[in-house]
């Protein structure tokens, strides 16, 4: 078992322009303060204010956006981190675990990971993800690349179709097709931080947002030992080399996770479970009284003194006792949130410490709040009620379907760029406008400069005479379109779709 020494994990070095050495605790703190500044001031964080949490295109400022949700996650993450450090101090383990001079960076890395955890999410949340993946699956047919005769391959892209006698190229084609059909917000977050925004964060800070450890091109069965850690794609083929270096710098075995990521994940789970229900009441999907009844019915029979009684019933009774009846809803959610935090945060901290050997190594194959405890049951209660009463509400489903259509429609609109030959697209990139390609020229001009530069840089690194050049160029071209559309805010995507479909 590896010795627990966080000095080997909280790596303050960066990929580029890293200080040659640090001499004091203050030097290390300054490095992580620089990370904070880069993150807080990044456009990716600002765009979260117009991205969906639960209710797309919401005009009511009291309802959460991705940004306000992320700020709440940041605060809960800070709370858990402080609780962990406080308990380790009581146990006199800070020095033994190499944390005595790293408490500030420990908290900061968790906080900033919490703030960043949703930056890769596309417009309209999970329905935006589904729209991107469905659109590419219909055209690339990744399943056809796995087993049946090559003649049955339905892939529409010539450069990605399988060919007899090209074993190594076919293996790469399979990877590329699977990768492009596995868009995921967490993987896009890694791409944003490193490839698109070039934030040059410390290795520890980036490691903390690598929530899932499965490569997006993975098509084999997931190992049972890492079934939870690899349940979703965590990074793309484009970032394979960077993630390999990240693992080396953080001393992580393949498919293992950075220790502080478990805290970020727990903070997210705690934050959204209550917030989604509060937003539903704000939207008048149900009243606070109806919500209490939903929670009561879903929990079932219980004894006085149970966790439900201490958290939910206590919040309800205190809010009813308030003489200002018009603020009873606000009072209920204030008490519910406080009661929930006071139970789940210490429990998450205790789970982190109790499982620290596996967490430090990176192969603890569970979430901190995923077990058979009452705390886990309370979290599941909130999630199940939200799933049944909020996400299945007709108004929410209609907005999600509209979001799915918007993203699918935008991909249709930009498809001419993906249908160009390699020669034509290369000419368009070089000249930016080509007279004989009027539609493609106008579409290319609409792509952001940052995304176009990322494409150009990636393609320029390829050997043009290599057999895989055409398929890898097409891969980066698809990434270009995915980067652009996934980087839109909900409102921008909605307006862009309406403009280009000529419906206004």
From Swiss-Prot:
**What sequence ranges are listed for the domain HD?**
66-273
Q: What is the top EC class of this enzyme, as a single word?
A: hydrolase
Output the GO biological process annotations, alphabetical, semicolon-separated. dGTP catabolic process
Q: Does the keyword Magnesium apply?
A: yes
Q: Which GO terms describe its molecular function?
A: dGTPase activity; magnesium ion binding
Enzyme Commission identifier(s):
3.1.5.1
* Reported cofactor(s): Mg(2+)
- Disulfide pairings: none
One Pfam family in the UniProt entry: HD
Q: Does the keyword Magnesium apply?
A: yes
Matches recorded under InterPro entries: dGTP_triP_hydro_central_sf, dGTPase, dGTPase-like, dNTPase_1, HD/PDEase_dom, HD_domain, PHydrolase_assoc_dom
Domain of life, per lineage: Bacteria
Q: Which CDD domains does this entry report, sorted A to Z?
A: HDc
Q: Which UniProt keywords apply?
A: Hydrolase, Magnesium
* Gene3D superfamilies linked to this entry: Hypothetical protein af1432, putative deoxyguanosinetriphosphate triphosphohydrolase like domain
Biological role? dGTPase preferentially hydrolyzes dGTP over the other canonical NTPs.
Listed NCBIfam families: dGTP_triPase, PRK04926.1
* Assembly and oligomerization: Homotetramer.
Q: Show the HAMAP family listed in the entry.
A: dGTPase_type1
Family statement drawn from the similarity comment of this UniProt entry? Belongs to the dGTPase family. Type 1 subfamily.
> What is this protein's name?
Deoxyguanosinetriphosphate triphosphohydrolase
Organism encoding this protein = Klebsiella pneumoniae subsp. pneumoniae (strain ATCC 700721 / MGH 78578)
Identify the taxonomic lineage of the organism of origin.
Answer: Bacteria, Pseudomonadati, Pseudomonadota, Gammaproteobacteria, Enterobacterales
């Amino acid at each position: 078992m590896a010795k627990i020494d966080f000095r080997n994990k909280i790596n303050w070095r960066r990929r580029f322009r890293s200080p040659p050495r640090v001499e004091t605790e203050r030097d290390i703190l300054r490095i992580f303060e620089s990370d904070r500044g880069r993150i807080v001031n990044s456009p990716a964080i600002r765009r979260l204010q117009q991205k969906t949490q639960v209710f797309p295109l919401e005009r009511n400022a009291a309802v959460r956006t991705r940004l306000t949700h992320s700020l709440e996650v940041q605060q809960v993450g800070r709370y858990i981190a402080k609780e962990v450090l406080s308990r380790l101090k009581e146990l006199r383990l800070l020095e033994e675990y190499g944390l005595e001079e790293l408490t500030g960076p420990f908290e900061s890395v968790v906080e900033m990971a919490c703030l960043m955890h949703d930056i890769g999410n596309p417009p309209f949340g999970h329905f935006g993800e589904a729209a991107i993946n469905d659109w590419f699956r219909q055209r690339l047919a990744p399943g056809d690349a796995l087993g049946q005769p090559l003649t049955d391959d339905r892939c529409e892209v010539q450069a990605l179709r399988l060919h007899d006698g090209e074993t190594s190229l076919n293996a790469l084609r399979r990877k590329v097709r699977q990768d492009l059909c596995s868009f995921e917000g967490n993987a896009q977050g890694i791409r944003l931080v490193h490839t698109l925004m070039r934030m040059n964060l410390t290795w520890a800070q980036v490691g903390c947002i690598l929530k899932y450890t499965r490569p997006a091109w993975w098509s084999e069965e997931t190992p049972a030992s890492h079934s939870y850690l690899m349940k979703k794609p965590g990074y793309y083929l484009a970032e394979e080399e960077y993630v390999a270096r990240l693992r080396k710098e953080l001393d992580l075995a393949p498919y293992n996770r950075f220790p502080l990521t478990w805290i970020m994940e727990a903070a997210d789970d705690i934050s959204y479970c209550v917030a989604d229900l509060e937003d539903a009441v704000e939207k008048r999907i149900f009243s606070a009284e109806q919500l209490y009844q939903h929670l009561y019915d879903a929990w079932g029979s219980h004894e006085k003194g149970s966790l439900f009684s201490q958290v939910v019933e206590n919040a309800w009774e205190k809010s009813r006792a308030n003489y200002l009846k018009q603020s009873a809803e606000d009072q209920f959610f204030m008490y519910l949130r406080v009661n929930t935090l006071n139970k789940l945060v210490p429990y998450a901290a205790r789970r982190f410490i109790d499982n620290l050997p596996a967490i430090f190594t990176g192969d603890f194959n569970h979430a901190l709040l995923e077990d058979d405890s009452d705390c886990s049951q309370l979290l599941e209660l909130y999630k199940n009620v939200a799933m049944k009463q909020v996400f299945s509400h007709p108004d929410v489903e209609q907005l999600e379907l509209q979001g799915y259509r918007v993203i699918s429609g935008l991909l249709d609109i930009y498809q001419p760029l993906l249908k160009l030959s390699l020669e034509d697209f290369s000419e368009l990139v070089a000249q930016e406008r080509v007279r004989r390609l009027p539609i493609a020229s106008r579409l290319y001009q609409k792509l952001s400069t940052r995304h176009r530069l990322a494409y150009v840089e990636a393609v320029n690194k390829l050997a043009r005479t290599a057999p895989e050049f055409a398929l890898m160029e097409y891969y980066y071209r698809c990434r270009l379109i995915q980067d652009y559309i996934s980087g839109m805010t909900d409102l921008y995507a909605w307006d862009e779709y309406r403009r280009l479909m000529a419906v206004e």
